[in-house]
Amino acid sequence: KSFPMHKFRSMKVNAPDIRLKDGSTYNGDDDPRVTKLGRFIRKTSLDEIPQILNVLKGDMSLIGPRPDPLDWLDKYKEEEKVFLNVRPGITGYNQAYYRNSADAQEKIDNDVYYAKNISFALDVKIILKTIKTVLYRENVNVTRE
């Protein structure tokens, strides 16, 4: 399902889309597209707060795989698409355990794992790990080639 995802702006207007070799978004600490305030709200995950509106509207949940742009749907193998049946979340397995350190394929694999093992207990673990990850700013800016 397509929906507009709310976020605080953290990049300069008309910033170019910079991708790594694996197709994932560049999130380096030296990213020239990110504003000074943007660096702060990203490191503290405050840029995600507006997505609570998406949760209230029913487009997202608190926990689930992060939503991807629609033009990415054709890059998934058929057996990977299982995670697309799960409502996307503000935080998820990848954000809690890897934040920005997992490459594109690892993120897909982790989203598939979550979709196949979804449970209240796993969601509680993800929430607790997300809190720890945000408080200790783990894996915020990881440069991968």
Language model segments and positions:
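Conserved small/aromatic sequence motifs within transmembrane helices
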Residues: 1-145
